[in-house]
């Protein structure tokens, strides 16, 4: 089996003090980049997609391509549902072969969030599918999800303990000052809050919104209990920036082989950097 649950790899990261990168992908080329780079560096890997990505590319296509790439590189990986909000949607994608999901009920009141997440956990654990959930809200935009900065809420440590106990989740995404998208000013992460959450919660902790974070912040967050680091925007910017630059310089270009190569190379450098920041090279 080359498509696996994220549970074991996150537990190993927790025990050994590194983080597993979760890279958001969109198509064949972005899948190729993250799998090939992770395989070359022997890094554990989570390939993530938002509802919009799976709608665009097709869940069956993503799972099949990821499985074939994983097999060809002899590199097991998790295909992960990022920021999914509906149990019915999750059921359909689990049936298609996904083995790692994030249910996002962070926009609901605390009790309703627990109820939704518990229903997803009860279903997914029957099929050995790992479940991540979010408590607190990150500002910024992810796919079609937009959270105004004033509506962003940090995770409350004591609520985190209750949330994990009542839902049975495998990992918890927390809000400590990161945001989706790029930062207009250097973020100030609440490391004290992270420490307090870690003291109360025994499941692996997840950091969303890591694009553009300084290496020192990622390293410190991992030392305090972060076991999974999500990166999306930074990958898209590198890929699309190189693509636009090539087409600007070669206005008559029409062969995808030519303009996809520099785009993939630019994205690959970001993937390599994130793996280094996570301290997970050679940890597969």
UniProtKB/Swiss-Prot annotation:
Q: Does the keyword Metal-binding apply?
A: yes
Q: Does the keyword rRNA-binding apply?
A: no
Superkingdom, according to UniProt? Bacteria
Pathway linked to the protein: Carbohydrate metabolism; D-tagatose 6-phosphate degradation; D-glyceraldehyde 3-phosphate and glycerone phosphate from D-tagatose 6-phosphate: step 2/2
Q: Enumerate the catalysed reactions.
A: D-tagatofuranose 1,6-bisphosphate = D-glyceraldehyde 3-phosphate + dihydroxyacetone phosphate
Q: Which residues bind Zn(2+)?
A: 83, 180, 208
GO CC annotation: what is one? cytosol
E.C. numbers = 4.1.2.40
Question: Which InterPro entries does this one have?
Answer: Aldolase_TIM, Class_II_FBP_aldolase, FBA_II, TagBP_ald_KbaY/GatY, TagBP_aldolase_GatY
Keywords (A to Z) from UniProt: Galactitol metabolism, Lyase, Metal-binding, Zinc
- Fetch the Pfam families from UniProt: F_bP_aldolase (PF01116)
Q: What class of enzyme is it?
A: lyase
Tell me its cofactors.
Answer: Zn(2+)
Q: How is the cofactor bound?
A: Binds 1 zinc ion per subunit.
Query: Which GO BP terms sit in this record?
Result: D-tagatose 6-phosphate catabolic process; galactitol catabolic process
Subunit text: Forms a complex with GatZ.
The family database entries (PANTHER family) matched by this protein are listed as: D-TAGATOSE-1,6-BISPHOSPHATE ALDOLASE (PTHR30304), D-TAGATOSE-1,6-BISPHOSPHATE ALDOLASE SUBUNIT GATY-RELATED (PTHR30304:SF0)
Function text: Catalytic subunit of the tagatose-1,6-bisphosphate aldolase GatYZ, which catalyzes the reversible aldol condensation of dihydroxyacetone phosphate (DHAP or glycerone-phosphate) with glyceraldehyde 3-phosphate (G3P) to produce tagatose 1,6-bisphosphate (TBP). Requires GatZ subunit for full activity and stability. Is involved in the catabolism of galactitol.
Supply the name of the protein.
D-tagatose-1,6-bisphosphate aldolase subunit GatY
Source gene?
Answer: gatY
């Amino acid at each position: 089996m080359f498509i696996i649950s994220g549970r074991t790899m996150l537990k190993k990261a927790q025990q050994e003090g590194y983080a597993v990168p979760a890279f958001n992908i969109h198509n064949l080329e972005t899948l190729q980049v993250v799998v090939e780079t992770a395989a070359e560096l022997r890094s554990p890997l989570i390939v993530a997609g938002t509802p919009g990505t799976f709608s665009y590319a097709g869940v069956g296509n993503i799972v099949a391509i990821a499985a074939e790439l994983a097999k060809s590189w002899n590199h097991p990986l998790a295909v992960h549902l990022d920021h999914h909000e509906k149990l019915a949607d999750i059921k359909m994608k689990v049936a298609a072969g996904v083995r790692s999901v994030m249910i996002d009920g962070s926009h609901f009141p605390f009790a309703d969030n627990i109820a939704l997440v518990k229903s997803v956990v009860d279903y997914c654990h029957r099929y050995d599918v790992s479940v991540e959930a979010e408590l607190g809200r990150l500002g910024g935009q992810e796919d079609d999800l937009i959270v105004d900065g004033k509506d962003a809420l940090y995770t409350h440590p004591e609520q985190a303990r209750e949330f994990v106990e009542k839902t049975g989740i495998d990992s918890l995404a927390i809000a400590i000052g990161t945001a989706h998208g790029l930062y207009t000013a250097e973020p100030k992460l609440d490391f004290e809050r992270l420490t307090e959450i870690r003291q109360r919660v025994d499941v692996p902790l997840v950091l969303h919104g890591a694009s553009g974070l300084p290496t020192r912040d990622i390293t410190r967050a991992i030392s305090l209990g972060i076991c999974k680091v999500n990166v999306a925007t930074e990958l898209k910017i590198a890929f699309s920036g190189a693509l636009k630059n090539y087409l600007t310089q070669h206005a008559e270009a029409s062969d995808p082989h030519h303009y996809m190569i520099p785009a993939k190379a630019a994205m690959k450098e970001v993937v390599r950097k994130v793996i280094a920041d996570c301290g997970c090279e050679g940890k597969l």
